[in-house]
Amino acid sequence: MRARSTLSFAATLILATSGAVSAQQTSPTMDADGTIHAQDVVIPTSDLLSAQAKRLLIERIEHNPKFDPGPNLVERARAASLEMAQPVVKRWQEIYPATIQRVTMNGVPTDVIVPKAGIAAKNRHRVLINLHGGGFFTGGGGAAGQVESLPLAGAGRVKVVAVDYRLAPENKFPAASQDVEQVYRALLKTYKPENIGIFGCSAGGALTAQSTAWLQKQHLPRPGAIGIFCSGLMPGFWTGGDSSHVAPVLNRQLPYPAERIGEGMSGYYLSASDAKNPLAVPGISLSVLSHFPPTLLVSGTRDVALSNLLASNVALKQAGVETELLVLEGLGHGDVFLFAGAPEAKEADALIWRFFDKHLGR
């Protein structure tokens, strides 16, 4: 108890003295419900970031897409997503050259990505499945999946199958999970389930969790390991908790209004009733989670999804699942893949592959 009190006092002292640097600054105030109001707060980029990552962070923040409500919002968002992804794909191809072949598997379009350096001997009987991000309504057509797949294919010298799953609002849950199931069934004809890994970022991270639950329902063998990146598996997926309020500010955006927390599930794809369905929101059922394979969770300190992901890690551990947690200093939502070539991204890709290499069968 005394140690705890001493630590609490030390933390309070550090915070108090750090806030006394400038007498001209206004101290934060607190409402009765604990809400903090801060003025004159200055937040620099992390001094722990590489120069390249800092430059990419500033460029991303400067060019954050802004979408005014109005007609053709989905079409405009899809065009912006493609515009952002294409130069990143080009850069990853320069770092990790790969062949990309469009292949239809059980009626579902995919991109099969194979490193030009060749598949490592130990990975000849292994494969990764990528589920791209994009809020469940953008990212189709291949580029978004290639942004996430090329660095893993290159870092691990392993084949990656990027699934171009059906998008909202044209399609609703469980369309994307059904598409993943069909690709998984096709790969099971060639690969043992324990040799298959599934990963995705943002909506793709949420879909990784949904698909893992969906495969359970279909009585299919579980994959060897999964990676949930830039998303959690609790309601809201990439909203909820402190990061919903803090991360937007760190990325020069307005925080989520309190009444909108939870909309991260994307109303385009999920209905209100889906929030109570563990096939749509696996985090609400420890029973469903208990059947998950080893799971890697990846986020960054500027990622709006960080709090949900941290809560998801606790839920998975409560369910008895082996997890690893990787939180990247100074990086925001999806930057682990968007910052092509930055030391932080390459180091993270190597760690991500190390997780799959550890847990996948041979």
Which residues fall in each region the model found?
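Bacterial N-terminal signal peptides
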Residues: 8-18
